[in-house]
């Protein structure tokens, strides 16, 4: 009896300690956020017309004012004037709304402090962590999996390079919340009847994730296979076929329509063509000639925002994603080169942007708060070894797929993350080329970590069950 009570107390203490650590890391990381690369303006125009204490929102390129506004320094204070001028919607707005309201009521009616706007992001992540801990607490080997699953997740989502997104008005802020939400729902569906409540929760989770950014569209068809197997649809098509179509079509249409950036012109297609496939082509001049762009060879060295737009202006009508496809059909080996290119640059959560406000000496004391990011950069596999590790993760999934309970659930979550990281990487590099590649590979990097933790814990759960190892709890 005494052992039972001590075990229960250990579970509760560990649970409270893990929650407290996540809260502490978030508090300590409040002074950090990622500098704006120009994407802020797409979303912030709903509630802010620009930085609060800088003279202009778009200073001339190359000036000290431009350098301070973009890329090099994080801007924590924004005008709170609600211009409502954005032409797109992002589900992260739902997370920022509570913090913006509290800011207006209790802090300032005219100046928005970005860390306060991030309150909703942090609270929802805390709630998801609490839900995960509750599930582990009432499952087999709770102490083991709290230490090997929940604690590493806190280190991942609390590391400075990830937490900086919470204070930034990037689309990834929403993805970092609604991705774990969807994974929790998928795991939950593996251990309970998939009734109307389950499908309602799944529909909400996938809708929020798909509307977090345009590149997340693939989650709608991908995740469905894990909650509504094909054999079930074929067995009862009158019931499940309309459900399957609705669970794919509605979030897919909403995501593509709401997150589309209006008036962007050939920007992304230019980056995908000149900054993407042509950079890996063995005969770029020949490909340009075939596309009727022979006179645009000099554009290969130019980013869209640094001369590329003017360079290619006479040929905008010829620059499209169909041109990207034509290059890939002419040189299909580019697909493998893209995979190698991404693999060589994997395992890096740090962007090439500034992370601190002007005059802040915080970086001198912040490395200790970036433990997971540094660990990942130094010891996680990249290049050819990344491919080997993906195969090993696949083997781990195969070994635990048919296991009941936690092991089987984690195997499914691991496979979902594994497939998503490959798809997401290609969507990003095909969609926007090599521009801001570290930022675009951020979500695939997080997905690798989630897959690794899921498969590792699935193997632990299977091993503990098979050999009858008794751990505390």
Where are these regions (language model features)?
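Membrane-interface anchor segments at the N-terminal boundary of transmembrane helices
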Residues: 106-124, 342-417
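Transmembrane signal-anchor helices characteristic of membrane glycosylation enzymes that use polyprenol
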Residues: 9-69, 248-260
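Membrane-proximal stem/loop segments at transmembrane-domain junctions that anchor or position
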Residues: 47-81, 259-360
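Transmembrane-helix motifs of polytopic, lipid-linked glycan transferases
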Residues: 116-143
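Membrane-interface alpha helices of multi-pass inner-membrane proteins
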Residues: 198-214
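Membrane-interface transmembrane helices that cradle and orient dolichyl/undecaprenyl
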Residues: 182-201
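Short hydrophobic/aromatic helix or loop-helix immediately within or flanking a transmembrane segment
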Residues: 68-109
């Amino acid at each position: 009896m005494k052992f039972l009570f001590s075990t229960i107390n250990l579970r509760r203490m560990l649970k409270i300690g893990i929650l407290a650590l996540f809260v502490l890391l978030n508090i300590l990381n409040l002074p950090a956020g990622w500098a704006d690369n120009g994407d802020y303006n797409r979303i912030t125009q709903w509630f802010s017309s620009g930085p609060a204490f800088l003279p202009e929102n778009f200073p001339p390129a190359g000036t000290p004012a431009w350098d301070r506004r973009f890329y090099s320094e994080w801007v924590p204070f924004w005008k709170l004037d609600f211009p409502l001028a954005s032409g797109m919607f992002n589900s992260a707005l739902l997370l920022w709304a509570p913090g913006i309201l509290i800011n207006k009521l209790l802090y300032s009616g005219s100046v928005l402090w970005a860390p306060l706007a991030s309150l909703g992001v942090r609270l929802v992540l805390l709630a998801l962590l609490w839900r995960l801990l509750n599930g582990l607490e009432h499952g087999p080997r709770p102490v083991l999996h709290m230490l090997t699953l929940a604690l590493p997740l806190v280190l991942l989502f609390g590391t400075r390079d990830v937490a900086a997104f919470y204070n930034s008005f990037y689309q990834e802020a929403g993805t970092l919340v609604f991705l774990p939400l969807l994974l929790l729902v998928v795991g939950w569906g593996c251990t309970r009847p998939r009734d109307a409540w389950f499908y309602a929760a799944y529909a909400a989770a996938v809708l929020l994730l798909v509307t977090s950014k345009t590149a997340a569209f693939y989650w709608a068809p991908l995740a469905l296979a894990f909650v509504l197997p094909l054999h079930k649809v074929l067995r009862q098509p009158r019931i499940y076929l309309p459900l399957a179509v609705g669970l794919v079509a509605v979030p897919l249409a909403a995501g593509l329509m709401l997150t589309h950036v209006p008036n962007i012109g050939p920007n992304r297609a230019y980056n995908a063509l000149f900054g993407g496939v042509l950079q890996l082509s063995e005969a770029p001049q020949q490909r340009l000639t075939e596309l009727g762009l022979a006179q645009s060879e000099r554009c290969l060295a130019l980013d869209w925002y640094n001369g590329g737009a003017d360079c290619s202006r006479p040929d905008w009508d010829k620059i499209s994603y169909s041109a990207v496809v034509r290059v890939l059909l002419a040189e299909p080996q580019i697909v493998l080169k893209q995979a190698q290119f991404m693999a060589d640059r994997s395992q890096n959560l740090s962007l090439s942007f500034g992370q601190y406000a002007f005059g802040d000496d915080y970086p001198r004391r912040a490395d200790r708060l970036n433990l997971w990011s540094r660990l990942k950069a130094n010891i996680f596999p990249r290049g050819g070894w990344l491919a080997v590790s993906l195969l090993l993760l696949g083997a781990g999934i195969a070994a635990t797929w048919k296991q009941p309970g936690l092991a089987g659930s984690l195997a499914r979550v691991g496979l979902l993350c594994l497939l998503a990281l490959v798809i997401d990487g290609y969507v990003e590099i095909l969609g926007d080329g090599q521009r801001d590649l570290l930022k675009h590979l951020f979500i695939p990097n997080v997905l690798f970590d989630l897959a690794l933790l899921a498969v590792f814990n699935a193997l632990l759960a299977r091993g503990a069950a098979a050999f009858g190892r008794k751990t505390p709890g």
